[in-house]
């Protein structure tokens, strides 16, 4: 991957990680497609083989049906893990942006530091919301709210496997408002049903980070 000249360290790192996620999703989607095509082709041949008895047909079909079932279960786990990774990419990138542009995260949180080293020595932990407050102060773009509320709640569900009424309402709103995320509700929970959905979430997160860094640059210029 080629990094454009003139990029900041934040931009270069973001572009590298985003491209890596995109390429990984592409490979996973292709692998899934190839497995399904081969298994379904084998099933088609078995189903249409008139020389087989019903018992023989069932016996020969079973390993391919099992393969498809195992493939889908594996894909569900992989998609869940990737979503968690995508949100971590968002959180850590916000932290890096604040550090790179020397934004006063502690001050926005109401913490007064006597020395710059105090932040490191006291190991003060900041949240995603703290970094967002340091970048956007009071008003946040809609795309940032989508990430920090809706996608965050979906990540929380994928991490913990549980959802109270509020979280369910948020995820249900994702299903209705963002069909390109490919989130599906079944009797036993919520699932991301396509790698394309994760690629679309990646694009939203990447766009949000571009806006965050652009805003941080402006703040940095104003401060200096």
Specify the residue positions occupied by each region the protein language model found.
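Extended intrinsically disordered or low-complexity regions, especially N/C-terminal cytosolic tails and loops
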Residues: 1-84, 92-94, 142-149, 169-224
């Amino acid at each position: 991957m080629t990094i454009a000249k003139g990029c900041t360290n934040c931009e270069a790192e973001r572009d590298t990680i985003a491209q890596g996620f995109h390429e990984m999703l592409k490979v996973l989607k292709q692998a899934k497609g190839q497995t399904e095509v081969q298994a379904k082709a084998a099933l088609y041949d078995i189903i249409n083989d008139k020389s087989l008895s019903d018992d023989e047909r069932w016996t020969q079909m079973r390993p391919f049906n099992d393969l498809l079932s195992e493939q889908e279960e594996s894909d569900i786990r992989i998609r869940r893990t990737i979503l968690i990774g995508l949100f971590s990419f968002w959180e850590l990138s916000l932290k890096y942006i604040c550090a790179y542009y020397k934004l006063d995260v502690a001050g926005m949180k109401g913490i007064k530091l006597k020395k710059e080293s105090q932040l490191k020595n006291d190991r003060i932990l900041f949240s995603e919301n703290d970094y967002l407050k340091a970048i956007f102060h009071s008003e946040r773009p809609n795309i940032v709210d989508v990430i920090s509320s809706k996608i965050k709640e979906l990540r929380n569900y994928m991490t913990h496997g549980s959802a109270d009424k509020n979280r369910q309402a948020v995820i249900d709103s994702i299903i209705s408002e963002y069909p390109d995320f490919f989130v599906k509700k079944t009797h036993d929970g919520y699932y991301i049903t396509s790698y394309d959905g994760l690629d679309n979430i990646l694009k939203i997160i990447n766009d949000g980070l571009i806006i965050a860094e652009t805003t941080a640059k402006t703040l940095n210029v104003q401060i200096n």
